[in-house]
């Protein structure tokens, strides 16, 4: 990082984020994304995920500041003439690899997407989903009955995955969480921790009577018949965090929250 980094400021449409961006641009200037050294994202976790999806391929480190309802992936926003440049110089990086999802639908079309938090399959109607679970080409569960199932990254393991009673994964552990959502059968199965290079394939066993949708972060595809998930080997993003509250510490602390 250069001594005076060029910053591209991005803000969610929320009024506090827009106002904060205006103040920061006046103080530090603003650069186009392709000219910037760092991206500063102002908003909540939803906007951070949107920023990573839209601009992750640009390979720019992202420093987020919380101006939204949820900010697990963000640093605190401070507007008391805080020296942002000093914070950026001290910031610690966290490297994240997204999940790659490939979907086949009932109509025969295929689609793909990335997920930095999780890929989740959910029943579309009142009827439970019936799914099979294959890992690296081997069927591990012939029939999973329940509301659905998900695969979560370490960064996403504290979100939907944790609410579904999945494990919290340490950052840098090179693991994924495979977590059922309200499982009925097998009733005692509570999920698994997988190596990050595991290929996970879900098949919908009765897609006409029991339709299923899949969501990669916020991108939903309905009426799926097969979903394949693996960690990306090509895409990697870097988030920057204040050293006193870095992402690794946040994930660790979540395990002791009461």
Swiss-Prot record:
SUPFAM superfamilies: NAD kinase/diacylglycerol kinase-like (SSF111331). Its cofactor is a divalent metal cation. GO terms for cellular component: cytoplasm. Its main location: cytoplasm. It is an enzyme of class 2 (transferase). It catalyses: NAD(+) + ATP = ADP + NADP(+) + H(+). The active site is at residue 45. InterPro entries: ATP-NAD_kinase_N (IPR017438), ATP-NAD_kinase_PpnK-typ_C (IPR017437), NAD/diacylglycerol_kinase_sf (IPR016064), NADK (IPR002504). It is found in: Cytoplasm. One of its GO terms (biological process) is NAD metabolic process. One of its GO terms (molecular function) is ATP binding. Belongs to the NAD kinase family. Involved in the regulation of the intracellular balance of NAD and NADP, and is a key enzyme in the biosynthesis of NADP. Catalyzes specifically the phosphorylation on 2'-hydroxyl of the adenosine moiety of NAD to yield NADP. This is NAD kinase. It comes from Xanthomonas campestris pv. campestris (strain ATCC 33913 / DSM 3586 / NCPPB 528 / LMG 568 / P 25).
């Amino acid at each position: 990082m250069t001594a005076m980094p060029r910053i591209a400021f991005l803000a969610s449409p929320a009024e506090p984020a827009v106002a904060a961006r205006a103040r920061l641009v006046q103080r530090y200037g603003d650069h186009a994304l392709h000219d910037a050294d760092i991206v500063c994202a102002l908003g909540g976790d939803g906007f951070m995920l949107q920023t990573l999806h839209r601009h992750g391929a640009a390979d720019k480190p992202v420093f987020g500041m919380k101006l939204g309802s949820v900010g697990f992936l963000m640093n605190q926003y401070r507007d008391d003439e805080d020296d942002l440049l000093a914070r950026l110089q001290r910031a610690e990086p966290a490297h994240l690899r997204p999940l790659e999802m490939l979907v086949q639908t009932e109509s025969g079309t295929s689609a793909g997407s990335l997920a930095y938090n999780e890929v989740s399959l959910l029943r579309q109607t009142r009827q439970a989903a019936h799914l099979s679970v294959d890992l690296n080409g081997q069927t591990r569960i012939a029939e999973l009955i329940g509301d659905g199932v998900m695969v979560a990254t370490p960064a996403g393991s504290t979100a939907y995955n944790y609410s579904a009673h999945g494990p919290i994964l340490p950052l840098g552990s090179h693991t994924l969480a495979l977590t059922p959502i309200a499982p009925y059968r097998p009733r005692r199965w509570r999920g698994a921790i997988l190596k990050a290079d595991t290929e996970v394939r879900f098949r919908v066993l009765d897609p006409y009577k029991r339709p299923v949708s899949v969501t990669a972060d916020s991108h939903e595809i309905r009426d799926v018949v097969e979903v394949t998930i693996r960690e990306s080997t090509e895409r990697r993003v870097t988030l920057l965090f204040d050293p006193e509250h870095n992402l690794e510490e946040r994930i660790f602390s979540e395990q002791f929250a009461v």
